[in-house]
């Protein structure tokens, strides 16, 4: 969302979710793939988001981008001390006016194994785990 208006950000727009961000609010869109900080502040972020996940689960809501939606809501209410530039999560194949520092690989590319392989869906590893579970149940 580099150089885009916040109306194009894919924030959670359902007001029943703890991740809800109203139209017109928000200055940045934070990617969930890279985060960190001082211990106390980072643990506060983690415990807050954990409680929001529990609250949304109780209400049968999953934010549009899961934890990333919650991180955006958290940073809207608690602006971070430092916001890294987009070069730190530069999507592969994009043309942006700066050099990438951390490149996000396109998980759908076959040379990386594809999305299912990377998420271990329908992989040999999943099948082995299921067989092991069945063996334990049979004992």
Annotate each language-model stretch with its function:
Residues 1-19:
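Conserved donor-nucleotide/metal-binding helix-loop-beta segment in metal-dependent transferases, i.e.
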Residues 2-6, 100, 104-119:
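Secretory-pathway lumenal glyco-enzymes, predominantly type II signal-anchor Golgi glycosyltransferases
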Residues 13-15, 24, 46, 78, ...:
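Generic alpha-helical secondary structure signal
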Residues 19, 99-102, 133:
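Residue-level marker of intrinsically disordered, low-complexity segments enriched
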Residues 24-108:
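Catalytic core and acceptor-binding pocket of nucleotide-sugar-dependent glycosyltransferases
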Residues 110-139:
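Membrane-proximal basic amphipathic "stem/tether" segments
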């Amino acid at each position: 969302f580099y150089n885009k208006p916040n109306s194009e950000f894919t924030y959670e727009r359902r007001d029943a979710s703890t991740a809800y961000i109203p139209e017109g609010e928000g200055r940045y869109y934070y990617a969930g793939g890279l985060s960190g900080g001082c211990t106390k502040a980072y643990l506060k972020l983690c415990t807050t988001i954990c409680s929001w996940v529990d609250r949304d689960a109780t209400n049968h809501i999953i934010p549009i981008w899961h934890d990333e939606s919650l991180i955006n809501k958290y940073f809207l209410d608690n602006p971070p001390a430092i916001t890294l530039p987009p070069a730190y999560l530069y999507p592969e194949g994009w043309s942006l006016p700066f050099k990438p520092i951390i490149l996000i690989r396109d998980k759908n590319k076959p040379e990386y194994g594809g999305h299912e392989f990377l998420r271990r869906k329908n992989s040999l590893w999943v099948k082995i785990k299921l067989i092991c579970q069945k063996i334990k149940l049979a004992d």
